[in-house]
Amino acid sequence: MPLLLSGKKFHNDLKKNKCLAMFAPLEGGYETRLLRRMRAKGFKTYITSARGLGDPEVFLLNLHGIRPPHLGHQSIGRNGALGEVQQVIPQASELFNENDKDKLLWLLEGQVLSQSELENLIKLPTADNKLKIVVEMGGSRKLEWKSLNDYVLNEF
């Protein structure tokens, strides 16, 4: 398994495509090995789940508001009919603290994302040239990946 020794082909494909759809065996372990290889090559990495992202660009990169869960009967005198909106820092903000490093955003459970959300993820690296994205799209018998753009064109 030369891939697990160096990660060179994965690194080259990631640099070329900027967004990859990954299919890994369900027993796991492959993603952490590849993350370790990418860190060794100078990437700053961030791994998170794709569940509950909503608008990926806003949720990951911009300051945005959220509403806390409704906990039953509450007074509307203070907050109005819509409820209180809390400002939340971007989830992947720690990736953008250092401008000199390449950045790798790794999303688990990417199969829950819609076509439009995947298309938004494909557009993200155009704004920041050093940002690369890997989305795990499900299981496979062996570790394989392809361009996220090709995946969206062929699967939807």
Curated annotation (Swiss-Prot):
Family the entry assigns: Belongs to the complex I NdhN subunit family.
Subunit composition and interactions: NDH-1 can be composed of about 15 different subunits; different subcomplexes with different compositions have been identified which probably have different functions.
Pfam families, A to Z: NdhN
UniProtKB keywords: Membrane, NAD, NADP, Plastoquinone, Quinone, Thylakoid, Translocase, Transport
Record bears the keyword Thylakoid: yes
Top-rank EC class of the record's enzyme: translocase
Catalytic activity: a plastoquinone + NADH + (n+1) H(+)(in) = a plastoquinol + NAD(+) + n H(+)(out); a plastoquinone + NADPH + (n+1) H(+)(in) = a plastoquinol + NADP(+) + n H(+)(out)
Domain of life: Bacteria
Record's keyword annotation contains Thylakoid: yes
Membrane topology: Peripheral membrane protein
EC number: 7.1.1.-
HAMAP family noted in UniProt: NDH1_NDH1N (MF_01353)
Localization: Cellular thylakoid membrane
Naturally occurring in which organism (per UniProt): Prochlorococcus marinus (strain MIT 9515)
Gene Ontology MF terms in the entry: oxidoreductase activity, acting on NAD(P)H, quinone or similar compound as acceptor; quinone binding
Primary site of residence: membrane
Function: NDH-1 shuttles electrons from an unknown electron donor, via FMN and iron-sulfur (Fe-S) centers, to quinones in the respiratory and/or the photosynthetic chain. The immediate electron acceptor for the enzyme in this species is believed to be plastoquinone. Couples the redox reaction to proton translocation, and thus conserves the redox energy in a proton gradient. Cyanobacterial NDH-1 also plays a role in inorganic carbon-concentration.
UniProt GO cellular component terms: plasma membrane-derived thylakoid membrane
Gene: ndhN
Protein name: NAD(P)H-quinone oxidoreductase subunit N
